[in-house]
Amino acid sequence: MRAAALAATMTELADAGYASLTLDGVARRAGVHKTTLYRRWGTREAIVLEAMLEYASERVPIPDTGSLHDDLLALASSAAATATTPQGEAMVRAVAAAGGHDAALAAANHRFWTERLALDGEIVKRAVARGDARPDVDPVEVIEAVLGPIYFRLLVTGNRPGRAFIERIVDLAAGGATASCEPRT
């Protein structure tokens, strides 16, 4: 039931958008009664949050290649590929459109990114532990430096992030995380 409900939520999000998404619609699509959804999740925001986390964890795994650069490249590539699927685009646009006007969605979005950035930050923590990144680097900021330009392209310019673009932003972020801490003159 859980898997069907979460998949139905992502499909409903892609088809109807967040503003029109209802637990009735999700229940119909999942083939369950809406009271089942209310008992388990309670609110539309709660099921959307869990569906987004599940969707992202399935499609954007946390890589562990042994190389900071390669891990960031794999993460950025899978994030961009996921964000350009119908469900991924709906997820990104729903959060961008409703987040500023819908306090519950804004809170769910904040929880999503707090959890996801902490998970992704493990890439950088492993690099620090291997001696491949500066010990003073903030793992979340490195991940934001990689993912931020991807979402900027999708939301602001409407451009899809191509492979060359992804490689350039990863080069910049990895370079910053591994650069010497010596003072500039």
Predicted regions and their residues:
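Helix-loop "lid/cap" segments that line or gate small-molecule binding pockets
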Residues: 77-83, 91-101, 170-176
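Short, basic, alpha-helical segments at the C-terminal edge of helix-turn-helix-like DNA-binding modules
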Residues: 52-58
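Short loop-to-helix capping motifs
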Residues: 16, 43, 98-105
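Tryptophan-centric aromatic hotspots in well-structured domains and transmembrane helices
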Residues: 40-41, 147, 151-152
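Amphipathic alpha-helical packing segments from all-alpha helical-bundle domains
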Residues: 86-90, 103-129, 140
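Hydrophobic alpha-helical connector segments
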Residues: 60-89, 142
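Helix-turn-helix
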Residues: 4, 8, 12-46, 50
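C-terminal peripheral helix-coil segments that are non-catalytic and often amphipathic
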Residues: 74, 118, 122, 126-129, ...
